[in-house]
Curated annotation (Swiss-Prot):
Tagged with keyword Methyltransferase: yes
Post-translational modification: By homology to other fibrillarins, some or all of the N-terminal domain arginines are modified to asymmetric dimethylarginine (DMA).
One example GO MF annotation: rRNA methyltransferase activity
Modified positions (Phosphoserine) in chain numbering: 111, 114
Name recorded for this polypeptide: rRNA 2'-O-methyltransferase fibrillarin
Length: 305
């Protein structure tokens, strides 16, 4: 979905969704770059700014997107281990911050008292900036990512989602984060300096042999590479690194695979490609209202099939 921060900024007030909450792209979580969505939308005309703040109330206090009144927030475990729900004025998806006091992309942090009197910090996981968070809120049955898991993350971008995956797997787990873009890779490297369970790899995910010596066997492959040959890229990496019956979680953007076909047709084709690559699809979920024409497909890798 094309989004022009300047032009839509003014609309923030009237549409709420775009400027304020779906402004999770711009307001709620700083969108596709808080600076670009919130910043430019806000700076260009007071109405954009008001849209941010007001949508902010709907989406939670201001552009940062979090819960007001930390004392009243109750943290409950989500059915996916390592993921939590913060219940306050509204319910928010959160992960326990592996590096307390540090935010990665200006996300809201919530501090609560644990039973032993110490403070525990959680980070709000914005579904408008993370396909995995959108999938969890959409009701995925199994994400295979849990405390202690080893994850190969293809298409890590600047590390926004990767940082939350690192929180979920915790200090006993490991995230190998592969990103092709050097610009995004710089942000990824900076994030990994603090999160020591993230191993950043700035390389093309098609060229498995270039990082073969860095990656061990993993429990799950997550892919968000938005390339026409995405299924093949996942298959190459699964063959090299994924254990038998390991999990495969793929985020599919229909327009990146085939911009002329209907999204449902593209998704069905991708499922068929996965089956041909020894991946047994288990569930498929569209990501509305967070992303248009996106879906997540979850499967199990049957190495000896």
């Amino acid at each position: 979905m094309a989004y022009t921060p300047g032009s839509r900024g003014g609309r923030g007030g009237s549409r709420g969704g775009r400027g304020g909450f779906n402004g999770g792209r711009g307001g709620f979580g700083g969108g596709r770059g808080g600076a670009r969505g919130g910043g430019r939308g806000g700076a260009r005309g007071g109405r954009g700014g008001r849209g941010g703040a007001r949508g902010g109330r709907g989406g939670s206090s201001g552009g940062r997107g979090g819960a007001k009144g930390g004392a009243k927030v109750i943290i409950e475990p989500h059915r996916h281990a390592g993921v939590f729900i913060a219940r306050g004025k509204e319910d928010l998806l959160v992960t326990r911050n592996l590096v307390p006091g540090e935010s990665v992309y200006n996300e809201k942090r919530i501090s609560v008292d644990s039973p032993d009197g110490t403070k525990v910090e959680y980070r709000v996981w914005n579904p408008f900036r993370s396909k995995l968070a959108a999938g969890i809120l959409g009701g995925l049955d199994n994400i295979y990512i849990k405390p202690g898991a080893r994850v190969l993350y293809l298409g890590a971008a600047n590390g926004t989602s990767v940082s939350h995956v690192a929180d979920v797997v915790g200090p006993e787990g490991l995230v190998y984060a592969v990103e092709f873009s050097h610009r995004s890779g710089r942000d990824l490297l900076n994030m990994a300096k603090k999160r020591t369970n993230v191993i950043p790899i700035v390389e093309d995910a098609r060229h498995v042999q270039k990082y073969r010596m860095l990656v061990g066997m993993v429990d799950v492959v997550f892919a968000d590479v938005a390339q026409p040959d995405q299924a093949r890229i996942v298959a190459l990496n699964a063959a090299a690194f994924l254990k038998n019956e390991g999990g495969v979680v793929i985020s599919v953007k229909a327009s990146c695979i085939d911009s002329t076909a209907d999204a449902a047709v593209v998704f069905a084709r991708e499922v068929k490609k996965m089956q041909e690559e020894k991946i047994k699809p288990q569930e498929q979920l569209t990501l509305e209202p967070y992303e248009r024409d996106h879906c997540i497909i979850v499967g199990k890798y049957l190495r000896h099939q």
